Amino acid sequence: MTMTDPVADMLTRLRNANSAYHDTVSMPYSKLKARVADILKAEGYIAGWKEEDAEVGKKLTIDLKFGPNRERSIAGVRRISKPGLRVYAKSTNLPHVLGGLGIAILSTSSGLLTDKQAGKKGVGGEVLAYVW
């Protein structure tokens, strides 16, 4: 069975594992998911990720990050642009999540970028998700 929205599946797995205080979460690998994981790592929301060989295909394993008293580093995740309703933002009208405390992940002509990176480069694109 094919998955219609792999990014939403990734974000849901992250949200569920985070709320259950799991240390790692695994999912099927794709280049897009790996780029999203790169952004989450660079912004400090996850501890790291690795690509592993599975019986069929590859899998992406993400190490979740918690504070010293097991506080969650990811407070919330929301998928914005969906297969049935794409959401785009111009470079002059980029979204700001929680007044700049969170990030918006955009798919641009320059690759996947956060809202701040897209603003510096002056590019817009499809708004994939909000993370805070």
From Swiss-Prot:
Sequence intervals crossing the membrane: none
GO molecular function: rRNA binding; structural constituent of ribosome
GO cellular component: ribonucleoprotein complex; ribosome
Domain of life: Bacteria
InterPro entries associated with the record: Ribosomal_uS8, Ribosomal_uS8_sf
Pfam families: Ribosomal_S8 (PF00410)
Keywords from the named record: Ribonucleoprotein, Ribosomal protein, RNA-binding, rRNA-binding
One GO biological process term: translation
Subunit structure: Part of the 30S ribosomal subunit. Contacts proteins S5 and S12.
Family affiliation: Belongs to the universal ribosomal protein uS8 family.
HAMAP family recorded: Ribosomal_uS8_B
Its job: One of the primary rRNA binding proteins, it binds directly to 16S rRNA central domain where it helps coordinate assembly of the platform of the 30S subunit.
NCBIfam families cross-referenced by the UniProt entry: PRK00136.1 (NF001109)
PANTHER family: 40S RIBOSOMAL PROTEIN S15A
Protein name: Small ribosomal subunit protein uS8
Gene label: rpsH
